[in-house]
Every structure is written in structure tokens, then in C-alpha cells.
Design a protein with these regions (language model features):
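A residue-level detector for the "anchor" residue at the start of short, highly conserved motifs
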Residues: 1-184
Length: 184
């Protein structure tokens, strides 16, 4: 089991050569027999996976669904509010109790309900995932959602004196190399 605290990232190299980079406030667990009969890991939070090709499928299990691949690079965000999968290279299959959908390079799906939507978004793979590049990419993102990411990234607490501000939306790219930069 590997866990990260707020404002912490960790890189994990699995026994099959797969690299996992855990974002802040995330947890990765896997069996001690990983790579013998299965290549399955459990994720709560967010992580970027660069999966080494192999004969045994690589599976990421989250509270919201499962992602299966043979070898590729992709990001998963599995937090309380839903499940997001974006593919940088290769192809993945995303499934939950009700649906199965395939994604390929440059595609992202954001699942907020029990059904996988066929609403697939095209993403710029050179900017995704934004947290690995020390940026916040916002596309009609609520101020509340952005502030949650800022809190996780910098281990701070942001309070809204006016609750109406939470629903304001932001579109743009914010450099997140340091907190002063973000707050400007």
C-alpha cells in the first residue's frame, strides 16, 4: 500500500516495470503476488499510469469503476465526486456495473453517475494530465472545484466568505508551480 498526503506526490515502480505517479491525497494498493497471476491495483484518488506491455491485462479498480489495458499511458481521477479517465497513449477499456466503453489516445471520459456516458471529450495529450505539468487546466470549472485542487496541491484551506462564489466558472490554464503564482 502506498499513500500520499496533501501536497505530496510519489512515484512507484511495480514489479512488471509499470510506473505509477500518485497525486496528493491518493492511495494505491496491490497484492503481494502482483504480476504472478494478475496485474490488478486498487486506486482511491488520482494517479498517472505508464503500463508496461504484458500478456496479463493490467487492471485499475476504483470505487466508481475499472480500467483495463495491456500497455498504455493514462490518468485516472477517482475521488468522491466521480471518476475520470484520460488516455495519453494506447487504448483502455473503462467499465462499471452498468457499462463498458473504449477510449484511445487523446480521449477522456468524466463519469458522474452510475452509467458511463458516450460523451467522450478530446484532450490535448501534451497538456494532460495537468497536475503532472504543474498546471490547472480549467474548462468551465467551478471555483469550488478549482479550490479543492489548490487545497490538495498546496496543503492549505480555502474558505469562501461568499458562498455564491463557489458556482462561478473559470476557463483557462493556471501555472501551479507555486502558491503565489496560483493566487495571482
Amino acid at each position: 500500500q502506498v499513500m500520499t498526503r496533501p501536497a505530496e506526490e510519489k512515484s512507484v515502480l511495480l514489479s512488471d516495470g509499470t510506473e505509477v505517479i500518485l497525486n496528493s491525497e491518493s492511495e494505491l494498493t496491490y497484492d503481494r503476488n502482483y504480476n504472478k497471476n494478475n496485474r490488478s491495483v486498487h486506486l482511491i484518488g488520482e494517479a498517472y499510469f505508464s503500463v508496461k506491455k504484458g500478456d496479463i491485462p493490467f487492471n485499475v479498480l476504483t470505487p466508481h469503476g475499472k480500467v483495463s489495458v495491456l500497455g498504455t499511458s493514462f490518468n485516472i481521477r477517482a475521488r468522491n465526486d466521480g471518476f475520470e479517465v484520460g488516455v495519453n497513449d494506447g487504448e483502455v477499456q473503462v467499465s462499471n456495473e452498468n457499462s463498458l466503453i473504449s477510449l484511445s489516445k487523446g480521449q477522456l471520459i468524466d463519469v458522474k453517475s452510475e452509467f458511463l456516458s458516450s460523451n467522450i471529450i478530446q484532450i490535448p495529450t501534451n497538456q494532460y494530465p495537468d497536475w503532472l505539468n504543474r498546471k490547472f487546466y480549467c474548462d468551465e470549472t467551478t471555483l469550488e472545484s478549482l479550490c479543492l485542487e489548490i487545497e490538495r496541491t498546496f496543503d492549505i484551506k480555502i474558505n469562501f466568505t461568499n458562498p455564491n462564489l463557489k458556482s462561478l466558472t473559470i476557463t483557462g490554464l493556471i501555472e501551479a508551480s507555486d502558491l503565489d503564482n496560483v493566487l495571482q
